[in-house]
Amino acid sequence: MAKKSGSGLQSSAGLMRYYEADKNAIHIQPKTVLIAGALVGIAVIFLSAVNGFWP
């Protein structure tokens, strides 16, 4: 069998770059997304009812 060369540093270097970029990203909690979606849904239903588009 062929012997693998290298110690896998390239794959771990890619992971380190990913985690460094992830620290700089904007983080939003899942609860915040659900609440925002519910509020938008309620607003759409309310505005549809007010403007006479309710079925």
Swiss-Prot record:
Q: Which residues lie on this side of the membrane: Cytoplasmic?
A: 1-29
Q: Give the UniProt subcellular location, in the record's own words.
A: Cell membrane
Which residue ranges does the entry give as Extracellular-facing topology? Answer: 50-55
Q: Name one GO biological process term.
A: protein transport
What is one Pfam family matched by this protein?
Sec61_beta
Q: Name one GO cellular component term.
A: plasma membrane
Q: Provide the transmembrane region boundaries.
A: 30-49
Q: Which InterPro entries match?
A: Preprot_translocase_SecG, SecG/Sec61-beta/Sbh
Q: Output the superkingdom of the source species.
A: Archaea
Which keywords are on file for this protein? Cell membrane, Membrane, Protein transport, Translocation, Transmembrane, Transmembrane helix, Transport
Q: How does it sit in the membrane?
A: Single-pass membrane protein
Query: How does the record describe its quaternary structure?
Result: Component of the protein translocase complex. Heterotrimer consisting of alpha (SecY), beta (SecG) and gamma (SecE) subunits. Can form oligomers of the heterotrimer.
Task: Tell me which family the UniProt entry assigns to this protein.
Answer: Belongs to the SEC61-beta family.
Q: What function is annotated for this protein?
A: Involved in protein export. The function of the beta subunit is unknown, but it may be involved in stabilization of the trimeric complex.
This protein's name: Preprotein translocase subunit SecG
Per the UniProt record, the source organism is Methanosarcina mazei (strain ATCC BAA-159 / DSM 3647 / Goe1 / Go1 / JCM 11833 / OCM 88)
